[in-house]
A protein has these predicted regions:
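Short, Lys/Arg- and Gly-enriched loop/turn segments at beta-strand edges
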Residues: 14-20, 135-147
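Boundary regions of SH3-family modules and the immediately adjacent low-complexity/disordered segments
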Residues: 6, 20-48
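Catalytic Cys-His active-site segments of thiol-dependent hydrolases/isopeptidases
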Residues: 102-107, 143-170
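Conserved beta-strand/loop element in small beta-rich adapter and peptidoglycan-binding domains
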Residues: 1-13
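Low-complexity, Gly/Ser/Thr/Pro-rich intrinsically disordered linker/tail segments
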Residues: 176-184
Length: 184
């Protein structure tokens, strides 16, 4: 765990918060000098189950093109593993495990699912789709290059470049926002 990492707290004992990191119990200091706590409003049971699945995977490595849970038509892949994800495979896995929703395979196909929602109306559990520097000048779905799960209060759960994390959206991330989709 690095300074500035966002973690989901599951309990507190004395001066220590309990969290889950890479599927294992971990502890961080509860002293104010070391820890800032943000409280996020709860959503529907389905949304909370999807988020809980994502929280269990914090710290799992990012691998571009990681094996998907299924092929997009519901055929589950025998070589799937939870040892690595890219952004779209992470969303595909947590939406299926948490709510039984079969998301498609890539960000550019997932963005066609769900109900469009504007930035002003995004809510906990919505998928946020972004462009990136390489795709910024493209149009339509070809502009999409990243997906994240919105947690509320400007926080997202996603995986990009290193491992699955919770992070506060930066100005750059907001500038690359293209659209959002609601599933609940």
């Amino acid at each position: 765990v690095n300074a500035g990492d966002m973690l989901h707290l599951v309990g507190k004992t004395g001066d220590w918060y309990e969290t889950r990191y890479r599927g294992t119990a971990a502890y961080v200091s509860a002293k104010e000098a070391y820890t800032a706590v943000a409280y996020l409003d709860k959503a529907s049971d389905e949304v909370e189950r999807v988020i809980a699945e994502g929280l269990e995977l914090l710290g799992v490595p990012y691998v571009y093109g990681a094996v998907r849970l299924h092929d997009g038509t519901g055929n589950f892949l025998k070589n799937f593993t939870t040892s690595a994800f890219d952004c779209s495979s992470l969303m595909q896995y947590i939406f299926y495990q948490g709510a039984g929703i079969l998301l498609d395979v890539t960000t550019r196909t997932q963005v066609r699912q769900g109900v469009p929602v504007t930035w002003e109306n995004i809510a906990r559990g919505d998928l946020l789709f972004y462009t990136n520097a390489q795709r910024y000048d493209k149009t339509g779905v070809e502009r999409i290059g990243h997906v994240a799960l919105y947690l509320g209060v400007n926080y997202i759960l996603h995986t990009a470049s290193d491992y699955a994390v919770i992070e506060q959206m930066s100005a750059t991330r907001k500038a690359y926002f293209v659209t959002a989709r609601k599933f609940f």
